[in-house]
């Protein structure tokens, strides 16, 4: 099977409020335009459905990432384009996910902490500052920036459309997507040309 017909995982990492979920949903729509089956594993949804027993400590965070990576691996093996949108603050856990999944594209959604705090749509930073959430990344726990991600998006400097287009371009460069101008295989092109020739449209 050619690489571009295989599944892959786009693994977003970054602080809460950096824009991971917002970009994920636009990316999903764009990937569908390429004819791909797409699934999103959003941090909030995963915590609600698979990780109700876990908090925000380093150990709990690692377990959350292990569970997400396992699901990503299964979906990727079955040809799905998977989008993981979780903070995943620790480098070692992300590297383990990369090794387990295989077709792995790490995207660092980079945004200054003060901008994330201003956005704070979920109110998590506010709760963290009040002490209602312990071990919260960026406040009481560290975030380890990726050393060699496939892509860095600076969401305080670019809009969602620009960020998403950068991801699509990278996926094409890596061979996971065809360009839209090249949607037919050589065999399919031959059949189309033969049919058009038989109908008298081309000589």
Can you describe what each PLM-predicted range is?
Residues 1-9:
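Extreme N-terminal, non-catalytic leader segments
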Residues 12:
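Hydrophobic anchor at the beta1->P-loop junction of P-loop NTPases
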Residues 16:
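The conserved Walker
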Residues 20:
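Conserved lysine of the Walker
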Residues 25-70:
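Conserved substrate/cofactor phosphate-moiety recognition/catalytic segment
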Residues 49-55, 72-129, 135:
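ATP-dependent NMP and nucleoside kinases share a basic, alpha-helical "lid"
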Residues 110-113, 118-166, 177-179:
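Small-molecule kinase domains that catalyze NTP-dependent phosphoryl transfer to phosphate-bearing small molecules
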Residues 187-203:
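Short acidic, low-complexity intrinsically disordered linear motifs used
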């Amino acid at each position: 099977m050619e690489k571009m017909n295989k599944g892959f995982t786009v693994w977003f990492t970054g602080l809460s409020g950096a824009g991971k979920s917002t970009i994920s949903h636009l990316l999903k729509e764009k990937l569908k335009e390429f004819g791909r089956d797409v699934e999103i594993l959003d941090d909030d949804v995963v915590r609600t459905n698979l990780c109700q027993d876990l908090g925000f400590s380093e150990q709990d965070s690692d377990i959350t990432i292990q569970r997400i990576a396992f699901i990503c691996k299964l979906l990727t093996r079955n040809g799905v384009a998977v989008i993981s949108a979780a903070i995943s603050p620790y480098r070692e856990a992300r590297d383990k996910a990369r090794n387990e999944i295989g077709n792995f594209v790490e995207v660092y959604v980079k945004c200054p902490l003060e901008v994330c705090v201003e956005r704070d749509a979920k109110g998590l930073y506010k709760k963290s500052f009040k002490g209602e959430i312990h071990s919260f990344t960026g406040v009481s726990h560290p975030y380890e920036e990726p050393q060699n991600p496939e892509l860095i998006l600076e969401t305080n400097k670019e809009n969602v459309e620009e960020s998403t287009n950068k991801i699509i371009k990278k996926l094409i460069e890596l061979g996971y997507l065809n360009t839209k101008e090249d949607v037919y295989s050589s065999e399919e092109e031959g059949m189309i040309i033969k049919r058009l020739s038989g109908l008298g449209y081309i000589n």
